[in-house]
Amino acid sequence: MLNLCHALRGVRQFSCSVIVKVKCASCSIKLQDQDPSKPGYYTKPKSLPDSKLNPDLQDLKYLLFSQDIQLSKQAIQNDPDLKTKRDLLLRVICKRCSNALHHNNYNPEEFPESTLNDILNYVPRGSNVMHIVPFVEFPLHLDPNVLKRNDLDTTLVLTKSDQVFKDKNAVSKKVPIFMKQFLKNTLRIDSNKTFAISALKNWNISMFYNYFKNYTYLLGNPNVGKSTLINTLLQKYLGYKVKIDSTGKINSPSEEVMQEAFTNPKNFFKIQAAGVSHIPNLTRSGQAYQVGGKILFDLPGYSTSTSRLRLEEPIDERWLQRLRKTDLFNRKHIKQKTYESMKGTSQGGCYTVGGIFYLVPPKGSINQIVKYIPGPSKTFKNIEKGIDVFNSCNSSSGTHPLSRYCGIKSVICEKSQYKRYAIPPFIGSIEIVLKDIGYILLRTTGRYEFKGLHEIWIPRGIQVGIREPLENLIESGYQRYIETNGKESSCPRDRPIISSLYEMAPDEADTLNAVKKSYLEKTEKDLSARRFVDDDPYDLVQHLEKKKNPYWYYQW
């Protein structure tokens, strides 16, 4: 987004006149050196560089003197030239990003959340918008408020599809048909503008590029894959940052900078790339990119819930990095679907991954669990035992024999810090989705017999939902759609396929009746969604083969 010629022209004295032309290479905010309490601040060194150096280069190195960047050290050893000045300038990052990215000093208060209205201030009315949603956590992150806006031309883009499907065939052909009918049936949105992609696997990227229009904005929650998608496009179509002034004029990099795309493509891409990090809310300002013949805007992520828990508070930093780094996802789980078995017990036996959640099957049920969340799993006699063990792990500074299973901090090592949720009745398999964490597949085995509701205990503030297994749902729906020449919908109409869960009091014994009561309350203003309201709950759950997914209701 910098006009490099202007940025490097006439730099003689170190001052804010230099900095105001430079944005942080990580979060895109304007740099300043006057007020440490304000965004964009960077730290001056205590001592000056060698005064014999070219004065222009000295000023630029002065910006990076206190930052732990290997490239600046290497440049100081070499004879300075214009290229070195440009490289140093383009790699300047603010103190906030430097601390978080290079020194593991992360203060959540310095990464404030934005609302949808905050981000829409960057987007002119009538603009082309790509609503970015990670398919792996569908339907979480999907925002009907974006899709229903009449003042935007919106396309739904489902990222991280490689974490759901074995190959891109379903992603290319089957997902768009399914989503068109899902949006129409569930949200009354009539749209055929849906793309499922994988930026890491390069699935459908060419199709996506051919589709999106000039001057398109990427809109979505933090860490949904916007910057990763942009970087894939930059590499594939030789893209770069540009600056657009108030008159709409596009200021592109100089001819010298563009020449480096051919002489040193790795360095060129490193300079032009969008800032990708596992840290949420890292991007703080819009950034324009020239991708082929089109302009694409990367926007900061926005949050939809004011009560959302920052995962940095309860979850161990190393575990959190594994959860958030998409490239660490092990796709063998998609292909092999290796499961763990667990039987429900009278003591409340539970299954957990790191203490991030506790799944409690009903007594006597036999369950298979396929885990798509990084980290080792563990079963305990009950939730209290699990919390007690993880509390000991935190107290022992890593010396406890079960420390490798602990992914939470001491702040969450109390049962009162968790919410108890009842999962509405189901038969066969479901997927439990935890926002910004991942999902697990839960399957009950043997001949169906209602033994009680499954429960899951989750730290307060983490959003959770369930869905029918997504890959099977789309594959079987597509087959039905093709066999009937499109007469039957690929998305089921006879039942809901997604649902929120129902919060229960810790001492609630009759969870089934409590679920029905909550269901009636949630659907009070959506009567058309109600099903089986006249049935006795305990009679209803005896016939789930015919009356599927009772009390399923997703609250958008």
UniProtKB/Swiss-Prot annotation:
Molecular function terms in GO for this entry? Answer: GTP binding
Per UniProt, the keywords (alphabetical) are: Mitochondrion, Transit peptide
Instruction: Report the transit peptide positions.
Output: 1-21
Kindly give the PROSITE patterns that the UniProt entry links to this protein: G_CP (PS51721)
Q: Does the keyword Phosphoprotein apply?
A: no
Q: Which residues form the signal peptide?
A: none
Listed InterPro entries:
G_CP_dom (IPR030378), GTP-bd (IPR006073), Mito_lipid_metab_GTPase (IPR050896), P-loop_NTPase (IPR027417)
Cite the CP-type G domain residue spans from the record.
113-305
Where is it found, in Gene Ontology cellular component terms? mitochondrion
By its UniProt entry, which Gene3D superfamilies does this protein fall under? Answer: P-loop containing nucleotide triphosphate hydrolases
- Please state the protein's primary subcellular location: mitochondrion
Q: According to its UniProt record, where is this protein located?
A: Mitochondrion
Q: Describe the function of this protein.
A: Interacts genetically with prohibitins and thus may be involved in the mitochondrial lipid metabolism.
- So what family is this one in? Belongs to the TRAFAC class YlqF/YawG GTPase family. GEP3 subfamily.
Q: What is this protein called?
A: Genetic interactor of prohibitins 3, mitochondrial
